[in-house]
């Protein structure tokens, strides 16, 4: 029942969607649900969904773990910055879409400034226990290959939260259905605009 109350009607979604004239950019830790919630938001708003990590892999012609292994994190971050800049567009080309970013993207000062200037940044947050459980489902996280995932996630979360906190919208991704999280994000954006 409480989930039903959190959902928006299609007319509310349409009204909010008309007010959003730029990309919605999901930022936050790996495993928080940016891609899944982003797809749901894009579906609700009838706009394209773009996963920055997929675009980086397409541009580099190799998967992200291979980029990290072959060239290192600084090289990856440089490519990530360029790809996100392209995806954000410029001037009138800053179109409506939902963009999911990698966990470290918003920590880069140039990328963060670009997102804050041209988009609406939404910090999707979760507790470490949830992150550990979710990232354990996949074996494609280069930053977790070097030690205990819980310790690494705790450290990364502590390091990155001051950057994520600069996003104007902050939403916790918990056990509720993704549709509920997406509706809550749209309500928060509606109040912020």
Curated annotation (Swiss-Prot):
Could you tell me the EC number(s) of this protein? 2.7.1.71
- Note the PANTHER family from the entry: SHIKIMATE KINASE, SHIKIMATE KINASE 1, CHLOROPLASTIC
Q: Which CDD domains match?
A: SK (cd00464)
Its job: Catalyzes the specific phosphorylation of the 3-hydroxyl group of shikimic acid using ATP as a cosubstrate.
An example of a GO molecular function for this protein is: ATP binding
Family statement drawn from the similarity comment of this UniProt entry = Belongs to the shikimate kinase family.
Q: Name one GO cellular component term.
A: cytosol
- Cofactor(s) annotated in UniProt: Mg(2+)
Name used for this protein in its record: Shikimate kinase
Q: Lineage of the source organism? A: Bacteria, Pseudomonadati, Pseudomonadota, Alphaproteobacteria, Sphingomonadales
**This protein's encoding gene:** aroK
Cofactor binding note of this UniProt entry: Binds 1 Mg(2+) ion per subunit.
Q: Which Gene3D superfamilies match?
A: P-loop containing nucleotide triphosphate hydrolases
Q: Which reaction does it catalyse?
A: shikimate + ATP = 3-phosphoshikimate + ADP + H(+)
Query: Which NCBIfam families does this UniProt record tie to the protein?
Result: PRK13946.1
Which InterPro entries does the entry mention? P-loop_NTPase, Shikimate/glucono_kinase, Shikimate_kinase/TSH1
Binding positions (ATP)? 31-36, 141, 176
Alphabetized SUPFAM superfamilies for the sequence: P-loop containing nucleoside triphosphate hydrolases
- What are the binding positions for substrate in this chain? 53, 77, 103, 160
| Amino-acid positions noted as binding Mg(2+) in the UniProt annotation, renumbered to this chain | 35
Give, as in the UniProt entry, the pathway in which the protein acts: Metabolic intermediate biosynthesis; chorismate biosynthesis; chorismate from D-erythrose 4-phosphate and phosphoenolpyruvate: step 5/7
């Amino acid at each position: 029942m409480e989930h039903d109350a959190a959902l928006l009607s299609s007319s509310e979604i349409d009204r909010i969607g008309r007010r959003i004239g730029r990309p919605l950019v999901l930022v936050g830790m790996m495993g928080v649900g940016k891609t899944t919630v982003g797809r749901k938001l894009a579906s609700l708003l009838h706009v394209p969904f773009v996963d920055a990590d997929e675009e980086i892999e397409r541009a580099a012609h190799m998967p992200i773990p291979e980029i990290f292994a072959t060239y290192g994190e600084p090289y990856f971050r440089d490519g990530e910055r360029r790809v996100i800049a392209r995806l954000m567009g410029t001037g009138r080309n800053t179109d409506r879409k939902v963009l999911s970013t990698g966990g470290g993207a918003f920590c880069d000062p140039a990328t963060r400034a670009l997102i804050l200037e041209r988009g609406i940044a939404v910090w999707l947050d979760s507790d470490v226990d949830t992150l550990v459980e979710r990232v354990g489902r996949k074996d494609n996280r280069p930053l977790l290959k070097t030690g205990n995932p819980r310790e690494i996630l705790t450290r990364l979360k502590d390091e990155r939260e001051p950057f994520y906190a600069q996003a104007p919208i902050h939403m916790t991704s918990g056990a509720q259905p993704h549709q509920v999280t997406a509706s809550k994000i749209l309500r928060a954006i509606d109040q912020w605009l």
